[in-house]
Structure formats: C-alpha cells, structure tokens
C-alpha cells in the first residue's frame, strides 16, 4: 500500500505527556487517540502498544520513547510518551523529542508527587514553552481533596516560573474515556481544546535567523573558501552578509555562492545540506565547530550553567563518580571542546545515573544560546548529555 503523503494543511505541534509514575500518562495518551479516532482524527492506539516503546539513540544515549500522532480541528500533533522516569529525564535533557508544549498528568488521588516536581523543573530548565494540566482519576478522588490538589499544583507551577494562575487544569478520568464513558470522553475533548488554544504555535525553523554549523571546509582555487554543513535554521541567499562565530574571534563575510548536491542554488534553507562560498575568508580561518550565522544573532561563550544527565555504567557511561574540576569534552553540534565542571554547593560528587545542574567553563568559545544541547564525552565515548540553561559569560 502506498504511503499517504503528509498534508501540510494544519500547523504542526510537538507535545508530550509528563508527570509522576502511575499517574496515567500512557492511559491518557491512549485515551486521546481513542476519543479523536471517533472523529476520524487519529488511529486508536492501545495502552500496551504505547507502553512497549521502542528504543532510540540520541547523542549516544539509548532512550525509550513512544510516538503517536493525531489531529484536532485546528492542528496536527506529534505526541511522545516515555515508559520510564529515567527516559523522561534523558529525553528532556537531550532534546530527543523536542516539545513545543506538554500535558502534565497528575492523579487527583495523590496530588503532586516528587516526579511531578522534577518534571516541572526540567520543563522549565529545558524551555518547554507551555504546560496544560490534566487532573486524572477524578472519578475515584475525594472532591474536597481535588480542590486542594488544584491549589497546590498552581502554587507549584508558579514556584518553578510557569504562570500557575493561568494554566488550564482539566479534570477527568483517562481510564473512563478509554472505556468509552461519555463524561470521560468529554474531558478529553476539553483537554484537547485547552492544548489547541493555550499551547502557542511554534516558530518554524525556516522563519528563525539563519545558522549553519560548519562540518567541513575546503578551498576552491581562485574563488575562496567553502564551509559545508546542514542548515539548522533560517534561510540564506547569495550576497547576504554573515558572521563566522566560535572558537576564534567573530568575523564577517559575504556568501558569494550556495551549492547543494553539486548544483548551484539562489537560496538555502533549514534542513538543506549546503556548501557556502565565503568571500575573503582563508581556509585556515574556518574550521569544524564554528557556525555561520546571520550577523548579531548568536555570540560565542565559554561559561554557562547546564542541566546534565550522567550515564549509568550499564548505559556505557563511567564506572566511577566524578568531582568538581572534572574535565571532559563537550560536544556541541559538530565538535568537541574541553571544559571544566564545577558542582553546585553541597554536592561532593556525581554518580553515574545522576542528573543535576552544573557550571561549565570551556577552553574555547562556542556559539551558543540558552537551550543548546550537547553531549559529554571522554575520548570519543559519550558519558552524559546536557542542555545549556543559562549563559554566564
């Protein structure tokens, strides 16, 4: 059977379910597909089907993630659900599944639990733009308790920098919805309505300022130097001015040619593998790890705060803990740069399998923004992953 072509008639949004273990994330994911399938907007996916999530590798780390897709009247959604708590942490820190928004699932019978808190904090740290709350299991919870849970949740969200008073909290039962109960189904439609209206539509990569990480460099005699790589965001046209950022001092140039698969183009855009011919740039002035970007849109930095996950021994990580002044390589986009790690006050050492916030100082500057992902490596072997949460210098 021929594959159905992907129709771009609705805006596309990536979302996911987050929250404490056994609060009903996977049941809710199954319920959403079940309820929307009745409107012809989804293929119903059974709980067991989603729960057996396939393993994927992202930045050298194995993560189990289930992907489902569905539509509403307004949008097309790609939805991720992770079976295990560690998978969520790895997913959010590596950006394996970039989330434009998330549904925080909280059981009305329990209220916020430790992982609820941890997932909200992580969502804040890795810049998930918006959350919507689904208060689950309300059919078996005490109504007075539900009011308290809602208040507690709003306070918790505010504490972590989300607009706790404004976030939609939808009450329902994912299990009832999955069983076809009309009240249960109504809550799911209400939830999707909140997701449609409250989670903002993401800016598409092509509409962001131009940036291309340099993967390879070669010179064309008599014409100049070419940097090749995959355009990460934005568009580039011939004769546009660019900046070369990272490792060495930032310098300006002009793109005098754009090539893709040996063909000349007038314009390159996000997702293209392209070669850019740069005016007046010597081959020695361009190297892997630099980025070519729209002037003034990104700066090189050496010091930053990051949220990191350190691999367990079983995941191919370190066998021993590390301490302040640990000096691994940080792999950003296309290259490794050595850096020193400073642990937060009160943390003596970091064990394989931990996730925490650290300060890093690199020996050479790298073009970075908050939210940039990286791998932590020792001699080419991945031992962790991280996300830049704040630039210090």
Curated annotation (Swiss-Prot):
Residues 60-64 are annotated as: G2. GO terms for cellular component: cytosol. One of its GO terms (molecular function) is GTPase activity. Residues 136-139 are annotated as: G4. Its main location: cytoplasm. GTP binds at residues 19-26, 81-85, 136-139. Residues 19-26 are annotated as: G1. It holds the Pfam family GTP_EFTU_D2. Transmembrane segments: none annotated. Mg(2+) binds at residue 26. Residues 81-84 are annotated as: G3. NCBIfam families: EF-Tu (TIGR00485), PRK00049.1 (NF000766), PRK12735.1 (NF009372), PRK12736.1 (NF009373), small_GTP (TIGR00231). Monomer. Belongs to the TRAFAC class translation factor GTPase superfamily. Classic translation factor GTPase family. EF-Tu/EF-1A subfamily. This is Elongation factor Tu. It comes from Chlorobium luteolum (strain DSM 273 / BCRC 81028 / 2530).
């Amino acid at each position: 059977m021929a594959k159905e072509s992907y129709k771009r008639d609705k805006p596309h949004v990536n979302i996911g379910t987050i929250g404490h273990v056994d609060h009903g994330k996977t049941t809710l994911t199954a319920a959403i597909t079940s309820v929307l399938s009745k409107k012809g907007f989804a293929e119903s996916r059974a709980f067991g089907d989603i729960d057996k999530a396939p393993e994927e590798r992202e930045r050298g780390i194995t993560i189990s993630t289930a992907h489902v897709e569905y539509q509403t009247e307004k949008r097309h959604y790609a939805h991720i659900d992770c079976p295990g708590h560690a998978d969520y942490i790895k997913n959010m820190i590596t950006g394996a599944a970039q989330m434009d928004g998330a549904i925080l699932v909280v059981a009305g019978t329990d209220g916020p639990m430790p992982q609820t808190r941890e997932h909200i904090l992580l969502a804040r740290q890795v810049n998930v733009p918006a959350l919507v709350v689904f208060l689950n299991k309300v059919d078996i919870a005490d109504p007075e308790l539900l009011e308290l849970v809602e208040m507690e949740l709003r306070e918790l969200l505010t504490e972590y920098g989300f607009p706790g008073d404004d976030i939609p909290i939808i009450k329902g039962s994912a299990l009832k919805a999955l069983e076809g109960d009309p009240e249960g189904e109504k809550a799911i439609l209400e939830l999707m309505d909140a997701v449609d209206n409250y989670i903002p539509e993401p800016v598409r990569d092509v509409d962001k300022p131009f940036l291309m990480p340099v993967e390879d460099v070669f010179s064309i005699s008599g014409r100049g130097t070419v940097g090749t790589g995959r355009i990460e965001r934005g568009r580039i046209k011939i004769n546009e001015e660019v900046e070369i950022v990272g490792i060495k001092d930032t310098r300006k140039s002009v793109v005098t040619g754009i090539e893709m698969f040996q063909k000349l183009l007038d314009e390159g855009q996000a997702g293209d593998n392209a070669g850019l011919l740069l005016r007046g740039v010597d081959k020695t002035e361009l190297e892997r790890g630099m980025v070519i970007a729209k002037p003034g849109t990104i700066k090189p930095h050496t010091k930053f705060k990051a949220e990191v996950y350190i691999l367990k021994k079983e995941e191919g990580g370190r066998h021993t803990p590390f301490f302040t002044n640990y000096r691994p390589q940080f792999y950003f986009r296309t290259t490794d740069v050595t850096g020193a790690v400073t642990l937060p006050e009160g943390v003596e050492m970091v064990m394989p399998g931990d996730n925490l916030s650290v300060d890093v100082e690199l020996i050479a500057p790298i073009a970075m923004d908050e939210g940039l992902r990286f791998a932590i490596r020792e001699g080419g072997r991945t031992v962790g992953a991280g996300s830049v949460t704040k630039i210090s210098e």
